[in-house]
């Protein structure tokens, strides 16, 4: 990195431009390395997330799974509300401060933790006291366990809030492999194991939900240990925040509070609405469909958490061109990795839902609708991160509120008559509204192109290649599991064939050099645009 940023010996008029190009190359390599780690973790998380969905649906049936998913929805939405946007505030604030005993990063922790934990305690107490009234509506299908299940769910909110915030701090103070180990390995691997053990032991929904929550407590302890060293906790680091620490942090975080709740609870709002308006069986079907949709989104999530601190640094220094270059690169990665998943989910929805059980195949239309909507979500890239890391959380709030308004309005109209399919149509419309609005805002804020010709080529090639494979599978064996197997075989054969092309192999070599940090990769990739600092 030192060599990449050293001023050239013949720096003259071109010095600033060359420095900007070097900065862009360094940041592109850094994003490549972080992105790969995030993607590998997301792949493991997606696999075990699918295993968890199979365990819940097979172990508890449609009605029981509906109650289980509704309980997860309660804790997810409550946690998102109680964090008050502080997790994104940490991702924004910590990279701009100094770590260590003599640094000022540790002062952010009390600012970020105290208000959300107090909110979590209030919600836990209020939820437990009102469990008798809420359980029959929110957790229909859970029988006599409804009261205990909802009480346990609310009681866990402070723990999950603390875990969420410390995970954000961990991402900023340790290499990404530490975050991946906790968020993408510990949590997703432990949950299906413990929930499955509860189901096999006939422990019921209460035991199953306990199995889902225990890994959160383990992750909280792991995060505490991992963030203590870099922040200088217990070694004399200053923890008493100044008045400006409070005002600066919460001016950024509070507008994010509502949008964070909407982001985290977008699917779960649909599950809860479906449970109330259409019954637990439809909620179970919609929850199962949603698990597939969220699994496909993990590639984008892995990329987002990998580069958010990097975007915060770049945008904080006014280097918008470099930030846009990182965004464009990662959009291509996310598109190439996510679109095949969603296209296959749309075409072979029947095959995927058969894995949960025959009663879940009623969700085929819902799966198709949501899979197509997610092409929009992944196609625009992580525009939300550009807004948030650029300090424009208010604009992000506007886009998420627009999406939520569309989702809830259409849901109240469509769910009573169409069940899970109505919920999917409502959510799909909300997804498109939120992402297209955020993309427009991000383009205006960054002032740089967010879509390149390479992005369009990647989109066309992905749709064309997966479309051919899916068509062969459908014509050969239908839309069930045999057809899916044929389509996957054709895709694998196509990928192997692409590896024989010199241009493809050259592109892979460039990417691998970026991951290793080779300067040659920067030359192969070409110079980055000049900085737009102060534009």
Predicted regions and their residues:
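Membrane-proximal transmembrane or re-entrant/amphipathic helices at the cytosolic face
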Residues: 2-22, 471-535
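Interhelical loop/hinge segments that connect adjacent transmembrane helices in multipass membrane
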Residues: 2-31, 205-211, 223-267, 306, ...
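Signature of the first transmembrane helix
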Residues: 3-10, 14-19, 27-88, 115, ...
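Transmembrane helical elements of multi-pass membrane transporters/channels
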Residues: 33-50, 211-227, 240-313, 373, ...
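Helix-loop junctions and terminal segments of transmembrane helices
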Residues: 83-100, 172, 289, 293-335, ...
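Interfacial segments at transmembrane-helix termini and the short loops linking adjacent helices
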Residues: 131-153, 328, 336, 345-375
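Hydrophobic alpha-helical transmembrane segments
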Residues: 151, 181-232, 252, 401-412, ...
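Membrane-interface junctions at transmembrane-helix termini in multi-pass inner-membrane proteins
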Residues: 159-183, 371-402, 444
């Amino acid at each position: 990195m030192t060599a990449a940023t050293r001023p050239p010996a013949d720096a003259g008029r071109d010095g600033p431009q060359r420095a900007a190009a070097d900065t862009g190359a360094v940041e592109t390599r850094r994003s490549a390395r972080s992105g790969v780690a995030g993607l590998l973790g997301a792949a493991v998380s997606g696999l075990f997330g699918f295993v968890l969905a199979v365990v819940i649906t097979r172990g508890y049936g449609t009605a029981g799974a509906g109650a289980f998913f509704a309980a997860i929805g309660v804790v997810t939405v409550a946690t998102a509300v109680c964090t008050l946007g502080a997790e994104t505030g940490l991702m924004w604030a910590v990279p701009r401060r100094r770590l260590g005993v003599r640094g000022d990063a540790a002062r952010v922790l009390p600012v970020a933790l105290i208000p959300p934990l107090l909110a979590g305690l209030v919600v836990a107490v209020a939820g437990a006291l009102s469990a008798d009234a809420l359980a029959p509506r929110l957790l229909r299908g859970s029988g006599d366990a409804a009261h205990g299940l909802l009480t346990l769910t609310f009681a866990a909110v402070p723990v999950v809030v603390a875990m969420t915030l410390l995970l954000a701090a961990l991402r900023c103070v340790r290499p990404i492999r530490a975050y991946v180990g906790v968020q993408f390995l510990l949590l997703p691997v432990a949950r299906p194991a413990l929930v499955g053990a509860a189901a096999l032991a006939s422990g019921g929904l209460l035991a199953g939900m306990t199995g889902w929550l225990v890994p959160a407590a383990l992750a909280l302890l792991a995060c505490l240990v991992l963030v203590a060293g870099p922040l200088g906790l217990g070694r004399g680091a200053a923890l008493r925040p100044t008045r400006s620490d409070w005002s600066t942090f919460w001016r950024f975080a509070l507008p994010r509070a509502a949008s964070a709740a909407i982001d985290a609870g977008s699917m779960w709002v649909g599950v809860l609405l479906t449970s109330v308006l259409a019954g637990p069986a439809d909620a179970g079907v919609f929850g199962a469909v949603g698990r597939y949709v969220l699994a496909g989104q993990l590639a984008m999530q892995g990329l987002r958490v990998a580069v958010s601190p990097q975007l915060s640094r770049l945008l904080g220094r006014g280097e918008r061109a470099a930030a846009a270059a990182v965004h464009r690169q990662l959009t291509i990665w996310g598109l190439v990795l996510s679109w095949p998943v969603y296209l296959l989910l749309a075409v072979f929805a029947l095959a995927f839902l058969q894995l949960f059980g025959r009663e879940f195949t009623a969700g085929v239309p819902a799966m198709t609708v949501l899979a197509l909507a997610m092409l929009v979500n992944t196609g625009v890239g992580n525009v939300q991160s550009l807004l948030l890391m650029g300090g424009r959380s208010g604009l992000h709030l506007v886009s998420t509120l627009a999406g939520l308004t569309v989702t809830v309005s259409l849901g109240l109209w469509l769910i009573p008559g169409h069940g899970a399919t109505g919920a999917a149509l409502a959510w799909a419309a909300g997804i498109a509204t939120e992402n297209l609005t955020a993309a427009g805002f991000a383009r205006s804020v960054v002032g740089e192109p967010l879509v390149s010709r390479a992005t369009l080529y990647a989109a066309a090639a992905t749709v064309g290649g997966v479309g051919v494979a899916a068509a062969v599978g459908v014509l050969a064996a239908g839309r069930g599991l045999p057809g899916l197997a044929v389509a996957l075989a054709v895709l694998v054969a196509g990928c192997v064939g692409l590896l024989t092309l010199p241009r493809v192999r050259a592109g892979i070599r460039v990417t691998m050099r970026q991951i290793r940090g080779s300067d040659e990769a920067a030359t192969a990739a070409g110079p980055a645009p000049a900085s737009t600092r102060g534009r």
